Amino acid sequence: MVKQQNQIIREKSRNERMQRHFLENILPASVVEKLQLQQEQWSLQLQHDKIQTSSISQRHFGVGILYADLVGFTSFCKQVDPFSVMVFLNDLFEVFDGLCDDFNVYKVETVGDCYVATVGVVTGEQTVQDVSITDSMPKTSTASRTNAKDLVSFAKAMVWGSRQVKKPVLDTPALLRVGLHTGSCISGIIGTRNFKFSLLGDDVTIAAAMEKTGVPDCIHASEDVVKLVPEERWEKCKVHEAAVQSGVTSFLLSV
C-alpha cells in the first residue's frame, strides 16, 4: 500500500514538472509561477474561480523591441505547397530561436512569418513597475543601453542567419526586414483561454512600424535606438509619410 502511494506521488510530481516545463515554453517562468500560486491559493480555499490574468500585468522600461518578417512571403506562398512553407518557416525560426540565448533575447511570438522579440521584459536588464503606478518613471539609461546593444547584435545575427536558409523550390536565401525601437511597454496575459503572453504600448507599435517601413536585408531603427548604440554605421533614412505621422526619425543599418 505504501509502495503504491509513493509511486502515485512520484508520478504526480513527474507530471507536474512536465506541465511546468511545457508552460515555460509558452509563457515566461515568472508568469507561470504567478499562475500556479493563484491556483494553489484557490485550492486551499476550496474555490474554483477563473484565473485573474489582470493581476499578472507589469510595466517595463528601457525595453528593446524587435519585429522581423520575410520579404516576399505572400508571393512565395503562392508558388510553394503549404507543407514546404511550414517546414521552411520552422527551419528559419529554429535558427532565430537558437540565437536568443546568445543575446539575452526573449521571443514573444510568431505570427505567420513575423517574429517578435524583446530584451528587457523577461531577459536582459529588467526595470519593472506595477501597472497601478503611473506617477513616476524609474531611471533606465544603463539598462536601455545594454538592452539596445543586445537587440542590435541579435538583429544582425538574424539577418546573417536568414541568408543561410534557402527557400524550397526557389532555392533563394530568405531575406528579412527588421524593425527596432526602445522604450516602455506593458506585458501580460489577456483573457482566460488559450493563454498568450502579450506586449502593449505605443513603443511596441513604433517597433512594428519600423519593420513595415524597412528595407530588405537591413535593420531599420528609431533614433532612440541609434542614440543608445551610436557605434554602428547607421544611415539616416529619407523622411517618409509614416515617419512624419509618428514623429519618429529613423536610420538604416546595412548588414
PLM-predicted stretches and their roles:
Residues 2-111, 126:
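Juxtacatalytic helix/coil linker segments
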Residues 68, 99-153, 160-204, 228, ...:
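Catalytic core of nucleotidyl cyclases, primarily class III adenylyl/guanylyl cyclases
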Residues 185-187, 194, 207, 213-255:
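Cytosolic regulatory/linker segments at or just downstream of nucleotide-handling modules
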Residues 32, 89-94, 159, 207, ...:
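Short amphipathic alpha-helical segments
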Residues 60-62, 181, 213-215:
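Short, well-ordered loop/turn elements at secondary-structure boundaries
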